[in-house]
Amino acid sequence: MTKTGYINAAFRSSQNNEAYLFINDKYVLLDYAPGTSNDKVLYGPTPVRDGFKSLNQTVFGSYGVDCSFDTDNDEAFIFYEKFCALIDYAPHSNKDKIILGPKKIADMFPFFEGTVFENGIDAAYRSTRGKEVYLFKGDQYARIDYETNSMVNKEIKSIRNGFPCFRNTIFESGTDAAFASHKTNEVYFFKGDYYARVTVTPGATDDQIMDGVRKTLDYWPSLRGIIPLEN
């Protein structure tokens, strides 16, 4: 994590144009109004343990979420350091539940044992290709298929080579959080007080940053007064 108090995890909701953003041990539910500055906070900031009752007695309820990605229906994987869980986040209700875990990343995803991903993951986003997800740790990334529970191409690559659009930007060395937009093949990346909206092409390297790397609060007005968050 680059700076405490900023967005350190996020995932796209099953509800259109909504996303969960995690900051320290809290989160907000946001209508992020893709491509505009009409975003608004729908809920929060509130402690993870209060908004997700099923996480109350877990590491996530105590310390928060530092990486996450959506899967199918109302389900998402969440991470904190070397632990992870699959949850049903039950949008706009209090019926959330843990489906699997919490367990160590290496137990949930055995192919990460002995890799930089074993003890924590910085950020992730759901791809539009099948059940694939991109995960980031430091200046490296991997592509996994959560349905077959395997690493695509069995290789970990550098962000610099896989995402040439990030060369000579703050994202070349890593990212704090990411989530896939409801707009096809658009992804938001966050690092400290900056963000980038990127058009991605699954499996290719011709991604492009839209409008450059920008200050988050300049274009996400609903987060003013929320980040940086002081616990």
From Swiss-Prot:
PROSITE patterns: HEMOPEXIN_2. It is found in: Cytoplasm, Cytosol. It comes from the Eukaryota. SMART domains: HX (SM00120). Hemopexin repeats lie at residues 4-55, 62-112, 118-166, 172-223. Keywords: Calcium, Cytoplasm, Metal-binding, Repeat, Seed storage protein, Storage protein. SUPFAM superfamilies: Hemopexin-like domain (SSF50923). One of its GO terms (cellular component) is cytosol. GO terms for molecular function: calcium ion binding; nutrient reservoir activity. Its main location: cytoplasm. Ca(2+) binds at N8, D66, D122, D176. May play a role in response to oxidative stress and polyamine biosynthesis. Monomer and homodimer. This is Albumin-2. It comes from Pisum sativum.
